[in-house]
């Protein structure tokens, strides 16, 4: 009779991270998947990271997860998004070679101790005394375990839609998990339906690249992993094109044939990744929409047209593609499609991602209502860790909102639930000044060491990095200038008699360690990576105290009542999305408003300020 400590169901991004985390803790772990050869497949866009998402990848890496290292091994166009903005909202991103990414993930898993890969389909759970104690497989029968992690992605009762054609599938070419979906309903788990979509795939050699503008990779690629010294893969460029009036007219003329608009799909799709037909219907006044043509690999003929997700019939897809500059003669290798799938209301989970009604069952990824590789992987790591700790009779791990974006996401899911696919944005975090992508290891690697999921190699690397940073910080805090000395060096400060350290000067706008080294030569010995960390830390030091005060003030304002007469439309700065949700929910207090899906700390501050101003004006008139 087969048995393991932990069973992971599903081999997508959540499942791979869950399996690795569980095994790193020391639990005997089985990863169950339809096809071992498909482990680590990038089912949709060939990219990792981005705004908010890049923070999650850095946090996964700080916890010794796989995604950051795999992305570095496969990255073929690294770009740091929001480079001109502050470090807190910069988002590392890379296009990845699909094959290289998959190979990297599979290599990590096959080399992982305590991990067994099993090729089969789970058709039911074993439940004893209201606790999950294993699974039943389609071919191999019963496997017992101390905990099970479900990471079914879009496979749970998944259906693909292309025009009026519909069939059961987890993704193109792979079967759906239908029996397991039916069994979950029998356990009185609240399920819903969501949908996502993907564009057609095009042949690279049939695109007229010479007519299109190009987007270059960064000259100096910034890796995801704190262990990566250098990006080895050659960096490529992608091209940019646009839809036009002719494209839009073809889509409008055939909108009734779209699965999304014909009534065939009941699940809501991701708001921030709309289909092209959604864009035309909702933003009809636009004369065009930007499309990024992203090659899927160095030696792959496939191109991903980012921005053209659709569920229109294949003949319509071919027609509108021919109207787009550079794509007039493009060959469609695979049509775009929508996929609809079951998800579990995440409000049924604890913050360890365990289902409250079925102890021993953990959920991670799209089954919890999220969208995106990075969101799935982050949940997978946490669920796998907690499943292993449960079996080892250790306390469950909660990650707070003040510690990591992972904590923000899990808290949002569990406390607010979802009505549409959830994706991460930096605006969701109250503590984003301290939750930067550059300091993810400082925040999380010591915790991961306590939890037992960090390798000796990573821990040694982290300690050496911190020692260099501590030494550099100490040097900077012990080099001083008086106001007169500062002026003599061209530094403009108040003549208040206060001596300022090199660390203090780094908080000044446009100040760099390189400039300070002109009159403090000992600073030249600090390596470039430590310089970058120190400069960012010093820049934010002044603001972190204020952030803490703002948070304390916000907590006091939670009990502030929202008048029923409040004109939400009059509050400038609120998105139309939030205005409509607030009007629909009609929250009675700020605490109620906090629970609205998509509500951000910045939006709450706008509402509070508006209410307080209205009260002051009313008091003056009285």
Curated annotation (Swiss-Prot):
It is found in: Cytoplasm. One of its GO terms (biological process) is tRNA methylation. InterPro entries: FAD/NAD-bd_sf, GIDA_C_N, MnmG, MnmG-rel, MnmG-rel_CS, MnmG_C, MnmG_C_subdom, MnmG_C_subdom_sf. Gene3D superfamilies: FAD/NAD(P)-binding domain, GidA associated domain, C-terminal subdomain, tRNA uridine 5-carboxymethylaminomethyl modification enzyme MnmG/GidA. NAD(+) binds at residues 269-283. Keywords: Cytoplasm, FAD, Flavoprotein, NAD, tRNA processing. Pfam families: GIDA (PF01134), GIDA_C_1st (PF21680), SAM_GIDA_C (PF13932). It comes from the Bacteria. One of its GO terms (molecular function) is flavin adenine dinucleotide binding. Its main location: cytoplasm. Its cofactor is FAD. Signal peptide: none annotated. NCBIfam families: mnmG_gidA (TIGR00136). Homodimer. Heterotetramer of two MnmE and two MnmG subunits. HAMAP family: MnmG_GidA. NAD-binding protein involved in the addition of a carboxymethylaminomethyl (cmnm) group at the wobble position (U34) of certain tRNAs, forming tRNA-cmnm(5)s(2)U34. This is tRNA uridine 5-carboxymethylaminomethyl modification enzyme MnmG. It comes from Bartonella tribocorum (strain CIP 105476 / IBS 506). The gene is mnmG.
């Amino acid at each position: 009779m087969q048995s393991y400590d932990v069973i992971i169901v599903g081999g997508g991004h959540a499942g791979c991270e869950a399996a690795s985390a569980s095994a790193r803790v020391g639990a005997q772990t089985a990863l169950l998947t339809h096809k071992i050869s498909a482990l680590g497949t990038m089912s949709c866009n060939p990219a990792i990271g981005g705004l908010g998402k890049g923070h999650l990848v850095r946090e996964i890496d700080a916890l010794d997860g796989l995604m950051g290292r795999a992305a570095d091994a496969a990255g073929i166009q690294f770009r740091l998004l929001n480079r001109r903005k502050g470090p807190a909202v910069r988002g590392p991103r890379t296009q990845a070679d699909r094959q290289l990414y998959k190979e990297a993930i599979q290599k990590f898993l096959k080399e992982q101790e305590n991990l067994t890969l099993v090729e089969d389909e789970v058709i039911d759970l074993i439940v004893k005394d209201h606790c999950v104690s294993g699974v039943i497989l389609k071919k191999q029968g019963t496997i017992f375990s101390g905990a099970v992690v479900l990471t079914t992605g879009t496979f749970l009762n998944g259906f693909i839609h292309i025009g009026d054609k519909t069939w059961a599938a987890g993704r193109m070419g792979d079967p759906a998990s239908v029996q397991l979906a039916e069994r979950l309903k029998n356990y009185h788990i609240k399920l819903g339906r969501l949908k996502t979509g993907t564009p057609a795939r095009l042949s690279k050699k049939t695109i007229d690249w010479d007519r299109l503008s190009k987007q270059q990779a960064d000259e100096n690629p910034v890796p995801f992993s704190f262990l990566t010294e250098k990006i080895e893969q050659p960096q490529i460029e992608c091209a940019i094109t646009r839809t036009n009036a002719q494209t839009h007219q073809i889509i409008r003329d055939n909108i009734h044939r779209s699965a999304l608009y014909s009534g065939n799909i009941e699940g809501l799709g991701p708001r921030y990744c709309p289909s092209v037909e959604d864009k035309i219907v909702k933003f009809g006044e636009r004369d065009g929409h930007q499309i990024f043509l992203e090659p899927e690999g160095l030696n792959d003929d496939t191109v991903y047209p980012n921005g053209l997700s659709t569920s229109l019939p294949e003949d319509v897809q071919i027609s509108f593609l021919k109207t787009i500059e550079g794509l007039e003669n493009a060959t469609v290798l695979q049509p775009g499609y929508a996929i609809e799938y079951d998800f579990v209301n995440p409000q049924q989970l604890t913050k360890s991602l365990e289902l409250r009604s079925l102890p021993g069952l953990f959920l991670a990824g799209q089954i919890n209502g999220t969208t995106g590789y990075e969101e799935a992987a982050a949940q997978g790591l946490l669920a796998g860790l907690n499943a292993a700790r449960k079996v080892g009779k250790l306390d469950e791990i909660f990650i707070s909102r003040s510690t990591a974006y992972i904590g923000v996401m899990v808290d949002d899911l569990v406390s607010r639930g979802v009505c549409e696919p959830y994706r991460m944005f930096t605006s969701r975090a109250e503590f984003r000044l301290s939750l930067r992508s550059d300091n993810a290891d400082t925040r999380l690697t010591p915790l991961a060491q306590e939890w037992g999921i960090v390798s000796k190699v990573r821990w040694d690397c982290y300690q050496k990095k911190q020692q260099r940073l501590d030494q550099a910080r100490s040097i900077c805090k012990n080099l001083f200038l008086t106001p007169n000395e500062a002026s003599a060096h061209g530094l403009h400060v108040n003549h208040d008699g206060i001596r300022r350290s090199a660390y203090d000067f780094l908080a000044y706008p446009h100040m760099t360690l390189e400039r300070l080294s002109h009159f403090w030569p000992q600073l030249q010995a600090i390596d470039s990576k430590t310089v970058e960390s120190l400069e960012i830390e010093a820049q934010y030091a002044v603001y972190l105290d204020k952030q803490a005060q703002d948070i304390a003030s916000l907590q006091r304002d939670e009990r502030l009542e929202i008048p029923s007469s409040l004109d939400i439309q009059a509050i400038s700065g609120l998105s139309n999305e939030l205005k409509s949700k607030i009007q629909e929910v009609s929250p009675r207090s700020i605490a109620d408003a906090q629970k609205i899906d998509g509500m951000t700390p910045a939006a709450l501050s706008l509402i509070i300020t508006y209410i307080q101003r209205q009260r002051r004006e009313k008091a003056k008139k009285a």
